[in-house]
């Protein structure tokens, strides 16, 4: 196991390029970070171990030792992990770049074998050519990749992933790209590669190659918001932002093939870029549909529908002494926009319900309560219209001129009054509402701070480093609300 890690350790002394590219955290002396009890393959050193969350993309794909390097496959710095990363579609030309990379960094010839013999002959027990001391020579060239399937794109990180483990909690899946290249041609490349090995190691090399190169591809899995860590989220002005670390180089390549051509024909340029690259910290907003869905789901569980039957004049989130309506604790760590939306939505439903029914205390048990929870749970789904129709029917609508309408005459606060006027585009609010107006008001309240249809599915931390730099120049990394707050007392 951990053949790739061992190869990185021993081959790093071969050339100057290897010394820079093969310096991975798993071979360092740094103290490991706390485990998150997720077992899988570290995409940097390829060993099967306990993983932790990457500081660059917030996904669990790096081991407790490699995390010290703070490298991510989304970096722009041409380190080893970046060189093994390709975006879809995968072509034969890209796979040839992977093969050439392995052949350049991990060659097997008589010179290399003799070099390793000299470095390991320290005692008599090391004279034999066995797997224990020469594991670095047993690295076959395979075309397996850890695949991250984002909403808009798919990223392949190639490596030698040995062993098996449950992938249920992993954000990636292992895919075998051998058939995209050429199965027989890859076999020939590995047979020629192992010819220089001693006979005792050739059989072990062949077993490793065929065992890993013939594994079937796993079914790809879409990455969801729940796959991202919350450890790098910070709360500021009751908004959440995510800390992202990226390694940035002065030069960017348009395609992965251009990067590999530079490595092949001008390795000194790669060495220069590696020595001048810098690490940058970005503070990106965390507004995305995945987080909104999670917050809405939590709000549906925590909400107190009894408020719509009450005579409380305070906003729904400020009730603290009523045991049927108290939800104040639920907004301790929740975004301020969720609290604002909750207050307006509950106040509007309360006004409609009190205008059309005979209830006057929050302790009463009403059949409308489960539907109010469903409004939050279905707010980002296609079932929202059906749920709002059910909610409207609970208001005891009457038919006037073949149209169902409800009364709307209870007192509401000024901010909600102005907001409803803006949604309906009216100068004066009507005293009756039809079903379409009722649905438009609720959807307008929910979409007040962010339009669900225009939100990205996943956080900004999955974007490439180049994209983050462009968004930073445009001022789109931070939330607009943050930009309105000044640290100066004079502003």
UniProtKB/Swiss-Prot annotation:
Pfam families recorded for this chain?
Rota_NS53
Sequence motif pLxIS motif, residues: 483-486
From the Swiss-Prot or TrEMBL record, what is one GO molecular function term?
Answer: RNA binding
* One of the GO biological process terms: symbiont-mediated suppression of host cytoplasmic pattern recognition receptor signaling pathway via inhibition of IRF7 activity
Q: Report residue spans for region: Important for cytoskeleton localization.
A: 82-176
- UniProt entry keywords in alphabetical sequence: Host cytoplasm, Host cytoskeleton, Host-virus interaction, Inhibition of host innate immune response by virus, Inhibition of host IRF3 by virus, Inhibition of host IRF7 by virus, Inhibition of host RLR pathway by virus, Interferon antiviral system evasion, Metal-binding, RNA-binding, Viral immunoevasion
Could you tell me where this protein is found in the cell? Host cytoplasm, Host cytoskeleton
Q: Provide the residue span(s) of the region labelled Interaction with host IRF3.
A: 318-491
Q: Which GO terms describe its cellular component?
A: host cell cytoplasm; host cytoskeleton
Give me the ranges of the annotated region Zinc-binding domain.
42-79
Give the residue ranges for region: RNA-binding: 1-81
Q: What is known of its domains?
A: The integrity of the zinc-binding domain in NSP1 is important for degradation of host IRF3.
Write out the similarity annotation.
Belongs to the rotavirus NSP1 family.
- Physiological role: Plays a role in the inhibition of host innate immunity by inducing the degradation of key host factors required to activate interferon production such as IRF3, IRF5 or IRF7. Associates with components of cullin RING ligases (CRLs) including CUL1 or CUL3, which are essential multisubunit ubiquitination complexes, to modulate their activities.
Instruction: State how it assembles.
Output: Interacts (via C-terminus) with host IRF3; this interaction leads to IRF3 degradation. Interacts with host IRF7; this interaction leads to IRF7 degradation. Interacts with host CUL1 and CUL3.
This protein is called Non-structural protein 1
């Amino acid at each position: 196991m951990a053949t790739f890690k061992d190869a990185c350790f021993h081959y790093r002394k071969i050339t100057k390029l290897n010394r820079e590219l093969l310096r991975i955290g798993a071979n360092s002396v740094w103290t490991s970070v706390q485990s998150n009890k997720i077992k899988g393959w570290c995409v940097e050193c390829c060993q099967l171990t306990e993983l932790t969350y990457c500081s660059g993309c917030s996904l669990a794909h790096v081991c407790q030792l490699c995390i010290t390097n703070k490298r991510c496959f989304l970096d722009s710095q041409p380190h080893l992990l970046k060189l093994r990363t390709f975006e879809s579609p995968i072509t034969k030309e890209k796979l040839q770049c992977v093969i050439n990379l392995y052949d350049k960094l991990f060659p097997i010839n008589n010179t290399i074998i003799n070099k390793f013999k000299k470095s390991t002959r320290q005692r008599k027990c090391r004279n034999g050519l066995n797997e224990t001391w020469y594991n670095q020579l047993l690295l076959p060239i395979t075309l397996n990749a850890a695949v991250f399937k984002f909403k808009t794109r798919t990223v392949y990180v190639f490596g030698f992933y040995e062993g098996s483990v449950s992938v249920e909690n992993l954000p990636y899946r292992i895919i075998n790209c051998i058939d995209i290249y050429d199965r027989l041609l890859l076999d020939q490349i590995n047979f020629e590669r192992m010819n220089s090995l001693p006979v005792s190691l050739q059989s072990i090399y062949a077993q490793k190659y065929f065992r890993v190169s013939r594994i079937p591809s796993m079914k790809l899995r879409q990455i969801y918001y729940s796959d991202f860590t919350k450890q790098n989220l910070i709360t500021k002005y009751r908004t959440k932002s995510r800390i992202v670390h990226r390694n940035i180089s002065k030069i960017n390549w348009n395609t992965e093939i251009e990067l590999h051509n530079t490595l092949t024909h001008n390795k000194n340029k790669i060495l220069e870029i590696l020595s001048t690259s810098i690490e940058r910290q970005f503070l990106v907003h965390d507004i995305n549909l995945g987080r909104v869905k999670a917050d809405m789901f939590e709000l549906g569980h925590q909400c107190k529908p009894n408020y719509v039957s009450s005579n409380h004049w305070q906003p729904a989130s400020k009730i603290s002494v009523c045991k049927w309506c108290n939800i104040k604790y639920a907004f301790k760590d929740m975004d301020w926009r969720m609290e604002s939306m909750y207050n307006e939505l509950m106040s509007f439903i309360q006004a409609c319900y009190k205008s059309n029914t005979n209830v006057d205390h929050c302790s009463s048990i009403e059949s409308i309560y489960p539907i109010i929870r469903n409004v939050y749970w279905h707010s980002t789904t296609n079932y929202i219209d059906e749920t709002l129709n059910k909610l409207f029917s609970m208001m005891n609508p009457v038919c006037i001129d073949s149209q169902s309408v409800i009364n709307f005459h209870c007192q509401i606060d000024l901010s909600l009054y102005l907001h409803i006027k803006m949604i309906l585009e009216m100068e004066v609010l009507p005293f009756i509402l039809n079903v379409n107006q009722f649905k438009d008001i609720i959807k307008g309240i929910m979409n007040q701070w962010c339009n669900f249809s225009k939100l990205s599915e996943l956080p900004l931390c999955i974007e490439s480093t180049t994209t983050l730099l462009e968004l930073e120049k445009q001022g789109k990394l931070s939330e607009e609300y943050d930009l309105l707050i000044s640290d100066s007392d004079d502003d």
